[in-house]
Design a protein with these regions (language model features):
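Nucleic acid-processing catalytic cores of prokaryotic defense/repair systems
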Residues: 1-6
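Short amphipathic alpha-helical segments
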Residues: 15, 19, 23, 137, ...
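Coupling/switch/interface segments within P-loop NTPase motor domains and analogous charged loops
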Residues: 17-86
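Residue-level signal for secondary-structure boundary elements
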Residues: 31, 35, 81-84, 88, ...
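Short glycine-rich substrate-engagement loop in P-loop NTPases that contacts/grips substrate
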Residues: 88-110
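The catalytic "switch" region of P-loop NTPases
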Residues: 102-109, 114-124, 133-226
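Walker B catalytic acidic pair
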Residues: 128-129
Length: 226
């Protein structure tokens, strides 16, 4: 996509359109596996009950079944591949698509059904090898995920070398770490604290070269604060 002789806006549109088509196709395949159905036969029992209030779908009438949704996404993917493989790509690329990841907004537990019942209670979108994206694509992708903050659960994997020094050093509370005040926590659970400390001390004692079997026997029964 980056090598096409088209505008940056068109590249962005093609990139998100290709991502959307692949996410939709992968989700439909996963839905068949979830319900132990053969693919693509099981697609007819899957429904997308989306009201198209945001006008995301122009050539697809929704609500629709999985077979219709699969055909729509496959057609977009084919058209993008034709554009990429063309030796002389048209200046005005015409592909039905979007400037955002509509797949994450549309493919929700509230919109997906199987044989008239909810397909699942939660969905996790997993993006592997994000480091293989070009720098502009990776930046667009991450920026959208962070800024949109949709209700979708998204998991992204990439090699460490793809991260900038700032990304490698930056950490966020709740995502990378959780601050826990041990004193406040154990004050509410003194018996648990005693049990944990005894367990730790006995394991340390077992590793001692002094043939110490229990750390507790070396402690005074009554300790007074000074």
């Amino acid at each position: 996509l980056e090598e096409l002789n088209i505008s940056e806006a068109q590249k962005k549109r093609l990139f998100f359109s290709l991502l959307n088509s692949r996410v939709i196709l992968s989700t439909l395949r996963a839905a068949c596996r979830l319900k132990n159905r053969k693919f693509p036969e099981g697609l007819e029992d899957i429904e997308l009950r989306y009201d198209n209030s945001d006008n995301f779908f122009k050539s697809l009438e929704v609500p629709c079944n999985g077979k219709q949704l699969f055909a729509w996404a496959s057609n977009i993917e084919r058209n993008i591949y034709k554009t990429i493989d063309s030796f002389i790509p048209e200046v005005d690329v015409v592909v039905e698509g979007h400037d955002e990841l509509i797949s994450l907004l549309v493919l929700t537990p509230q919109n997906l059904y199987y044989q008239g019942k909810s397909l699942c209670s939660r969905i996790l979108f997993m993006f592997d090898d994000a480091h293989k994206l070009s720098d502009p694509q990776r930046s667009l992708f991450k920026q959208y995920i962070l800024e949109k903050r949709s209700g979708a659960n998204v998991w992204i994997s990439e090699r460490l070398e793809a991260l900038s020094p700032d990304e490698q050093l930056k950490s966020f509370e709740g995502r990378d770490f959780e601050e826990l005040n041990l004193e406040n926590f154990w004050n509410k659970n003194p018996s648990k604290l005693k049990k944990v400390l005894r367990n730790i001390s006995d394991k340390r004692a077992a590793l001692s070269s002094e043939e110490v079997t229990s750390f507790q026997e070396y402690l005074s029964e009554n300790l007074s604060e000074t």
